Amino acid sequence: MNLVFLWAALGGAIGSSLRYFVGKMMPSKFLMFESFPLGTFSVNLIGCFIIGFMGHLAAKKVFGDDFGIFFVTGVLGGFTTFSSYGLDTLKLLQKSQYLEAISYVLGTNLLGLIGVAIGWFLAKNFVGVN
C-alpha cells in the first residue's frame, strides 16, 4: 500500500493543529491597529521561513521523499494559511479598514519572501549542506 497519502494527511493534521494554536495565542490588537489578523500573519511568516530552510535541504536530498511529503506537503501545507490570508484581507476591506488591509498584504508578502531567503541561507551556510 502506498503511504504517501497517509504521510500527507498526518502531517496536515499536525500543521492545522499548530496553526489553530498559534492563531489563538495571538492578540487581535497589534501596533496601531485595532483589528489585525496577527495569527495568520505570524503563521505565514513562520511557514515561509521553514519552507525556505526545508526547501534547500530537500533540493540537496538531505531527507527522503516520504519525510518531504510528510513535513513540507503535510505539516507546512496544513500550517500555512494563504487561503485564510485572502479571507482575512477581504474582511478588512469589507470593514473599510484599508490601512490594515494594505499593511497586511504588503507585510505578509515582503516579510514572507525575506523569511524564505533567510531560511534558505541558514540551511545552506550553517547546516553544512552546500
From Swiss-Prot:
<feature type="transmembrane region" description="Helical">
    <location>
        <begin position="38"/>
        <end position="58"/>
    </location>
</feature>
<dbReference type="Pfam" id="PF02537">
    <property type="entry name" value="CRCB"/>
</dbReference>
<keyword id="KW-0997">Cell inner membrane</keyword>
<dbReference type="GO" id="GO:0046872">
    <property type="term" value="F:metal ion binding"/>
</dbReference>
<keyword id="KW-0915">Sodium</keyword>
<keyword id="KW-0479">Metal-binding</keyword>
<dbReference type="InterPro" id="IPR003691">
    <property type="entry name" value="FluC"/>
</dbReference>
<feature type="transmembrane region" description="Helical">
    <location>
        <begin position="67"/>
        <end position="87"/>
    </location>
</feature>
<feature type="binding site">
    <location>
        <position position="77"/>
    </location>
    <ligand>
        <name>Na(+)</name>
    </ligand>
</feature>
<comment type="similarity">
    <text>Belongs to the fluoride channel Fluc/FEX (TC 1.A.43) family.</text>
</comment>
<feature type="binding site">
    <location>
        <position position="80"/>
    </location>
    <ligand>
        <name>Na(+)</name>
    </ligand>
</feature>
<comment type="function">
    <text>Fluoride-specific ion channel. Important for reducing fluoride concentration in the cell, thus reducing its toxicity.</text>
</comment>
<keyword id="KW-0813">Transport</keyword>
<dbReference type="GO" id="GO:0062054">
    <property type="term" value="F:fluoride channel activity"/>
</dbReference>
<keyword id="KW-1003">Cell membrane</keyword>
<keyword id="KW-0406">Ion transport</keyword>
<dbReference type="GO" id="GO:0005886">
    <property type="term" value="C:plasma membrane"/>
</dbReference>
<feature type="transmembrane region" description="Helical">
    <location>
        <begin position="102"/>
        <end position="122"/>
    </location>
</feature>
<protein>
    <recommendedName>
        <fullName>Fluoride-specific ion channel FluC</fullName>
    </recommendedName>
</protein>
<keyword id="KW-1133">Transmembrane helix</keyword>
<feature type="transmembrane region" description="Helical">
    <location>
        <begin position="3"/>
        <end position="23"/>
    </location>
</feature>
<dbReference type="GO" id="GO:0140114">
    <property type="term" value="P:cellular detoxification of fluoride"/>
</dbReference>
<keyword id="KW-0812">Transmembrane</keyword>
<keyword id="KW-0472">Membrane</keyword>
<keyword id="KW-0407">Ion channel</keyword>
